[in-house]
């Protein structure tokens, strides 16, 4: 084993996280996430600067940790798969919108679905922006009495309309 030997699972992991961050930020390039021996930490590089993840905003950290956690668990539970796109599963996330800039709230579900196409995401939220970013078939409303409702289409509704009609 040589220090510079590439490990395919690690390379796939880095590529996936990079793709999610590109989707979230609507970038024209793929940022990098990798372990820096020099800093002895996981770092994020946007091409201009390299920063430890702990130096990033809470929103960046939140999406990075969620993405890395999903990818790690998928790799451990499915060692025979070479692509994250092939792996089916169910992932539950509570309050995905926590710490996220409104633009990132809008992009979050799409970015996850694009990068994990065979994963069913069950996401609990109170964010009207996150709700407005969903297509109708993705929404289920459960009230305090556990009554289940399938609200009308909320895609691209204003925040006020989502609060009034959906929540």
What is each residue range found by the language model?
Residues 98-99:
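Short active-site loops of ABC-family nucleotide-binding domains
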Residues 90-91:
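Hydrophobic "anchor" residues on beta-strands that sit immediately upstream
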Residues 102-103:
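Helix N-cap at the start of a conserved alpha-helix in ABC-type nucleotide-binding domains
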Residues 94-95:
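Walker B catalytic acidic pair
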Residues 106-167:
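C-terminal lobe/lid and adjacent interdomain/linker elements of RecA-like ASCE P-loop ATPase modules
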Residues 1-61, 65-86:
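Extended helical coiled-coil dimerization/tether regions that scaffold
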């Amino acid at each position: 084993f040589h220090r510079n030997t590439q490990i395919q699972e690690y390379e796939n992991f880095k590529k996936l996280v990079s793709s999610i961050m590109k989707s979230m930020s609507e970038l024209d390039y793929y940022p990098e996430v990798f372990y820096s021996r020099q800093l002895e930490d996981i770092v994020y590089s946007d091409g201009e600067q390299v920063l430890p993840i702990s130096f990033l905003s809470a929103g960046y950290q939140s999406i990075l940790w969620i993405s890395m956690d999903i990818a790690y668990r998928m790799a451990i539970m499915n060692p025979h798969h070479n692509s994250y796109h092939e792996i089916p599963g169910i992932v539950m996330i509570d309050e995905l919108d926590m710490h996220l800039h409104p633009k990132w709230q809008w992009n979050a579900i799409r970015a996850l679905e694009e990068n994990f196409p065979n994963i069913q995401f069950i996401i609990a939220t109170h964010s009207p922006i996150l709700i407005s970013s969903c297509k109708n078939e993705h929404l289920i409303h459960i009230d305090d009495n556990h009554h289940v409702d399938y609200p009308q289409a909320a895609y691209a509704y204003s925040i006020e309309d989502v609060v009034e009609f959906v929540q």
